[in-house]
Amino acid sequence: MCIRDRPYTELPPGVMHPRRIMHGVVEGVRDYGNRMGIPTVNGAIYFDDRYVGNPLVFCGNVGMLPKEKSFKEPQPNDLIVAVGGRTGRDGIHGATFSSAELTDKSEVESGGAVQIGNAITEKMVMDILLQARDEGLYSAVTDCGAGGFSSAVGEMGEELGAEVWLDKAPLKYEGLSYTEIWISEAQERMVFAVPEKHWSRFEELCSSESVEAVVIGKFVPTGNLELKYHEHSVANLSMKFLHDGRPPVVRQAIFEPKSDGDARVEVIEGDCEKFTSDLLKILGSLNVASKHWVIHQYDYEVQGGSVLKPLVGVENDGPGDACLLYTSPSPRDLSTSRMPSSA
């Protein structure tokens, strides 16, 4: 998290205080990550003046899956199945907004770009994804994050073609246009390519977990992306044009790193008590001070694989150099003689 902390009196007009943003981000990661059952084991918060108008949040996940399941390729006549959360007006233009220039009016004009998340729904979708994967019930899957159905179906059908029936998509409420249905983004909604012979079992599996699954089209070997709304064709583009039709944007930039100067440190001899105030200033710096208040909000023990944890030491109150996760926790693999050292 890259944030700037400064007094309210020094903020530019229309800028929300960075401290409020920081607490909101911390709470968002906590509430979503903990409910999803994903261990949050590492992170950093960096404070700098340059982030006063545009704080940055970088997130990353590391996962593992069987090698034979690491490739995805929709097959002709595979059903396009929407699974998870319903479609609403929230999350429209979220991907483009995140890269846009922010102004004092952005909060009002672009409020709809923010997704209304539901961690519980996504957790159930994740459980379905893993069970259906192990049973070999789908040939490809993509999330509806940036771009919604438009990016998910467009990406999956690039080498094949797709026909989408937008009026079949489950909606949160009535009144959405087919354009809004097509581009609305949601992290807890995913698109699966399901062979027709597996649809009955796939639907049964989703029902067992109370997860909504609806067929909204099929992948067809036409090389085109066709969108239909109540039997009317509202868009028809070739996949080649969709992915390669626009000339690539080429930009040139020159990076000139600043010189750190002489890195040598001058040692000053004298009474150590004279340096107490300087030491307290360093320890009080937001970039140096303890981040335990953030770390303790995150569940880094879930799944039972955390061997080296974020905080170490006798009192478990000092930051460690790194975290270590055991990839396949099993009681048979644990050495009881070494367990106390990992407690």
Task: Report residues per predicted region.
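Short, small-residue-biased leader/transition segments that mark boundaries at the very start
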Residues: 1-3, 329-333, 338-343
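Glycine/proline-enriched, intrinsically flexible loops and inter-domain linkers
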Residues: 4-328, 332
